[in-house]
Amino acid sequence: MPMPPQCASSKPPSPPPPPHPHEHEVGDDMAEEAPPPPPPPKLLYIAVSDAAARRAFRYTRPVLQGTLQLMGCKARHAFKISKRVFNVMRSEFLDASKSDTADNEENAPSLVKDVEMLKPKILEATLSSIPFELYKTQTTIVVSREKFLSVVCDALSSYKYVGPNQKADFLLACRIKERKESVTVLLCGTSGCGKSTLSSLLGSRLGITTVVSTDSIRHMMRGFTDEKQNPLLYASTYHAGECLDPVAVAQAKAKRKAQKLDIVSHPNTNEGRDDTSDDKAHHGSSELPPRTELIGSKQMAIEGFKAQSEMVIDSLDRLITSWEEQKQSVIVEGVHLSLNFVMGLMKKHPSIIPFMVYIANEEKHMERFAVRAKYMTLDPAKNRYIKYIRNIRAIQDYLCNRADKHLVPKINNTNVDQSVAAIHATVFSCLRRREAGEQLYDLNTNTVAVVNEEYRNQRAANSLGSKGMFQLIQRQGSSRNLMAILNTDGSVTKAWHVDKNNGNGSLDGTSSDKSTKNPMYDTFGKAEPVNLQFGSFGISAWMSDTGGTSHTGSVDDLRADGIETGGRYYSSCCSSPKVSDCPSKELMEDDYSVFGSEEDADDPPDAGTDEDLTDEERDMHEIEAGSVDEHSTKSDEEYDDLAMQDVMENGYWSDDEQAASSTKNSSNQEKNIHGAADGDVVDDEGSGNDRFHHNLAFFLKMSKKVAATELPCA
C-alpha cells in the first residue's frame, strides 16, 4: 500500500552536519600529497649455489663477517666489507629483478611479484603457507658462486686488501663455514698456562662455536664409576701419581726398558725373540731385577698424568671421529692431550692441527695460580696449585720435550693476543697446504714438520713486517704495482710485484724474475697504504715468487735479502737465492737461528731445564702484533659507530695507533730533512743521497694525505 504523501514528508531527512572549519583545507592537502612509497625490500640472505650442488648455502651478514675474519681480515674491516657486499647485491639484483619481472606483471599474482622483487633467478619458489618460510623467500637472493666471489673480492680490493692468492683463501674459508671441510685444533699444555682463555678467543676469531675441554670429558666419565673403584679418574692430573703403586710403576718401567734393550740387541732374530717372549710369558715378572729402584716424585707425577690421559683419550678419539663425519670444526684444549697420544690421533684424523702451550717463566706461572685459588694467595697451605707446582712444572717439561721430538709448535703464552694471532695465521696456512694435497702428519718420522714449518714462517714474517708499514707503490716511469714494506725513514725493506688488474690481489708471476734482478734503488712516484690478511703475519704468503702458500718460501728467503748494514736501501727481490754476497747475511742468520733446526728439535733438552733459550730471548720473540682486533664480538650498532669513527679519523689506516704514529713521526722526519738540506748530514754517495731524500720527502707527503683520504662507502 503506497504511503500517503503526508507520511512521506512527515519526517524530512536530517540536514548534513556543518562542515568543519578546516575540513576542506585538510582534504586539499591530502589530495595533493602522494602516498608514501613502500619501503625498499630487505636483503637478509644471500643463497650461494654451485653448479653441481642441489642446495644453496645461505649467507647472512654475521656469517659473511665471520668468513672474512677466518681468512685474516680485521674485525672492523670484515664488518664493513660484509655490509658493502650486501648493499651491492641488493642494488644490482633489485634492478635486474625489476626488469625481468616487468614482462610477466599482468599474469603474475601480486604475492609472486613481491617474492621475485629480490630474486634475480628464482629456481622454483613454492609459496608456502608458513609465514617465516615466506619471509625468508622474500628476503633471499640466489647467486652463483662465481658472482659471489667476484663481489666479495671487489669489496676486499676497495678496502685495500692485497694478497698473493686472495680469492683462493676466501674460497677456502667458505668451505670451512659451509661445513664442506673441517679442522680440529688441539691446544696441549699443563695446568695454568692459559689454554681455556686461548681456546675461547681462538674460537671467536675462527668462528668455531664448539670448544671442548678434556676436563669435561673426564667429568663425564666420572658419572659411570665410583671414586673408590677408580680413584685415578677422580684425581687431578698433577697429583694423579699418588693413586699409583710406586713399586708396580717401577717394575713396569724396568720391563719396558728391558724389552727395548732386547730389541736393540736382537733386531733381526725374530724366531729367537718369539721364544724369549714365550718364556717371559710363562715366568711373568720373575726375571725382573730383585731390587728395582723406585722412581722419584716428579716421575710419579708424570706417570699418573700419562695414566689418566690414556683413559680420557679413547673417548676423545670417538668424539673427533663423529665431528669429522659431520664436517664440524672444533677446538679441543686440555692437559690430557699428551703428545704421544696426539700423534696417535693424527694417524686416524687428518683434520687435527696441534699446538703446545706453555709458560717458560716459573714465577709468571705461579702468579697465574694466585687468582685461581679460593684465596688469592701464593701460600701452599691455601693454594693447592702452588702446593703441587713442582709436579705441574715437571709435566710441562715432559710435554715440551715431547713437542720438540714430534716438532709440535710451542706457544710461549706470555701475551694472549699475540698467541691467538700466531695460532690463527698458522692454522690457516696449514689449511692451505692441506688443500693443496699435503699431509700435515708424517707417518715415517712420526712428526708434524709441516705445522712446525708454518709456525716458524709466521714468526719470521711477523718479525719482518713489524719493522715498517705496508704500502702499494709504483716506481717512476713504471706501471707495475709493488706491495712494499716502508720504514719510517722512507726506505723500502722488501717489495713484491702485484697484479692489480685482476681485482683479486694476485701476484704477477711474469714479473717475479725481474724482481730478483732489479732491486729497488730507483725513486717511486706513487704510494698508498694497503692491508694484509693476518696483519704482519700475512707476509709469509708473499715469500715465494709464484704467490703460493708460505711453504714455498722459508726463513732462508729472509736471510738472503740484500740488506745493507746502514739500513738505507733494501732489496726488492721476492725470493732471493740461497747464496748471497750481502755483508749482513751472518747477522741475519744470527737473528733467525733462535728458531732452531729440525735436527735440534729431535734432541729434547734436559729434563731439569724448561728450554734452551733465556727469558730475554723469549721476551724478544713474544713481541708480536695481533692480526685481528681483539674486540671481535661487538654488536652491529657498535660496529656502525666504529665504522663512522674509522672513516672520519683514520681514512685507509686500519689502526688508530698506526695513524697516530705516522703523524708523530712526520714532524721528526721533517726536521731531519731540513737538517740534511742545510748540510748537517754529508753523504758520499751523491746521487744515491738525492734518491734517498726524494723517497723520504715523498713518503712524508703521502703520510700527511692519509688522514684526509676517505674510505669508499661502507
UniProtKB/Swiss-Prot annotation:
Polar residues composition bias: residue spans: 659-670
Positions of the UniProt region annotated as Disordered: 1-42, 259-293, 595-689
Disruption phenotype: Strong reduction in seed phytic acid with a molar equivalent increase in inorganic phosphate.
Comp. bias intervals (Basic and acidic residues): 271-285, 618-636
GO biological process, one term: myo-inositol hexakisphosphate biosynthetic process
Composition skew (Acidic residues), residue ranges: 595-617
Feature: compositional bias, Low complexity: 1-11
Tissue: Expressed in roots, leaf blade shoots, leaf sheath shoots and panicles.
Role this protein plays: Required for the accumulation of phytic acid in seeds. Phytic acid is the primary storage form of phosphorus in cereal grains and other plant seeds.
Protein's name according to its UniProt entry: P-loop NTPase domain-containing protein LPA1
Organism: Oryza sativa subsp. japonica (Rice)
Lineage of the organism: Eukaryota, Viridiplantae, Streptophyta, Embryophyta, Tracheophyta
